[in-house]
A protein has these predicted regions:
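An amphipathic alpha-helix signature
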Residues: 44-51, 73, 77, 81
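Hydrophobic helix-cap positions at the C-terminus of alpha-helices
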Residues: 53, 82-84, 144
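Short helix-loop boundary/capping segments at the starts of domains
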Residues: 56-59, 85
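Conserved GNAT-fold acetyl-CoA-binding loop/helix
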Residues: 58-79
Length: 220
């Protein structure tokens, strides 16, 4: 059972509320929703669920970085309050269309000069599959190339993360670079997806596939 969220200060609560009001302008229209999932802007109350994912080794074992301590709901709320003010990031929750259940995160970081890094993970892994991660990627690509006017989206994936690489290929991403990351102590693959590829609908070429991601395309 998720813990009750208690913002640590009135200031943090006001900051989060202001952030949420500003981010409403970025809400995706309902035509982005498919029969399985939709994405919506992250909210402060999502910390009640996401702090549990931050403490799950199964989610973080395939990523380039991971938490270095146990994360409490208060710590997660403080982190979200800061993150949601960043102008170079856009963060969304992945939710089931039938009941609104929050099952994962998808987001852009390092948004600058027409480029952004994509991250995605399914936190509730028992609810993975059925093309849900793929659908979320297609939706955030729509948002990135239309609302943010991006030219390129890229993802960095550990070579060993077979599920993430399969998801990237199904979404039309092209493998362009391999290198060794000293920080992650692993071989890393860079995948890219361009505006031209989006206009040619390459992300839709393979349809919705059943990809059960373990960690997805790199949560932070």
């Amino acid at each position: 059972m998720a813990a009750t969220l208690k913002p640590d200060s009135d200031g943090a609560e006001r900051l989060a509320s202001s952030t949420i009001r500003r981010r409403r302008a970025y809400c995706l229209p309902r035509f982005y929703m498919n029969k399985e999932v939709y994405i919506r802007p992250l909210r402060l109350e999502d910390a009640q669920m996401s702090y549990q994912w931050r403490n799950s080794p199964k989610i973080w074992r395939h990523t380039l970085s991971k938490p270095d301590r146990h994360i409490t709901v208060e710590m997660e709320a403080e982190s979200l309050a800061r993150i949601l003010t960043r102008k170079d990031e856009k963060r969304f929750a992945i939710c089931l269309s039938d009941n609104g259940a929050y099952i994962g995160n998808i987001f852009y970081t390092d948004i600058r000069d027409g480029e952004a890094q994509l991250h995605i993970f399914i936190g509730e892994q028992r609810l993975g599959g059925k093309g849900r991660a793929y659908s979320a990627v297609c939706q955030i690509l729509d948002y990135g190339f239309n609302a943010l006017k991006l030219e390129t989206v890229y993802a960095l994936v550990k070579e060993e993360n077979l599920a993430a690489k399969a998801l990237g290929r199904r979404a039309g991403f092209k493998r362009v670079l391999e290198y060794y990351s000293n920080e992650a102590r692993a071989n890393v693959v860079r995948f890219v997806f361009t505006k031209l590829m989006y206009e040619q609908k390459e992300h839709l070429g393979m349809g919705i596939s059943d990809v059960r991601g373990r960690g997805g395309l790199l949560p932070e």
